[in-house]
């Protein structure tokens, strides 16, 4: 094809591409692909058969934490931190050392705290619609995020030998080997001895966990992992943050599919112990209903941790490829304290529906919000019945986490001209 013909073709495509915007008209997230002859990204609509497990009775895990007959973790000693304790002659010492930023959390069970979570935490890439966060994981943790989620894929269309954090396809967004990101988390945990962090690994290819474990161990993070005494863990089985901190078991790790807690008791099976509201939500009402695991009874759901997915999406279709992208034009509203579609309203609705607040508010671009940046932390504090300090430092916000949609046809023009295309 001649250059003039290519230019004509690209020019003709531009209106078509621009017409692909969907709801929330100001949203302008774009996909930029790299590599040659990339396979078309596909979205799994259902996991493999047998992916969800249920248990008629608890299994005691070998090598797990010591526990009482009631199933609660026991520990010796107190959270003694020198100058961070105050005491009088007539009262017991009073702890003033915060756990996960709040003194009140130290004596609360892990299952009785609402954390702010970063949906697709590793996916930080300016100008790429595969991104879900603006600030890297160290900044996320510094600002108060205590739940991190990321999807694992094998690069090279599944032929790679090192698992990476990738968004649907490693040709869409490749955040690198999993041990790099996990190593950053481990380094942060090293420096913050009074914080408990939860990591949810998405098993994008439904691989056997034995393929991931060596790379998880390579990061050094396993020295901090929490090993539960039972499978599954009910709400009352969880220890307090203070107990976890005293034992140095300050990283809770889940795998969404194909977990094997018999072999790896610390890599916990998510859906036998946690349920989630609808994933990739496109409804601003954010119904607080159980989507995964399917067919979970309300009685069973009330005795599990739960994640409130509050990352609003739109579906973007271009050249036959369907992508879910963040509704960035509504980020401040979605991550706001009050109002239609806000995380604060949704958390309160969940609390009313289930009699307790969500354990995780899972959001995109956590540092956006209203009435101020980082309002998601104030929303979490409200349902935790603690007071958020607005003077806490929080990451700066750039002009926008996206690239304007008018440049999409230019991107595809470059792909066509340079021989990069999607097959």
Model region roles, listed by residue range:
Residues 2-8, 15-398, 404-422:
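Catalytic cores of phosphodiester-bond hydrolases, prominently lipid phosphodiesterases
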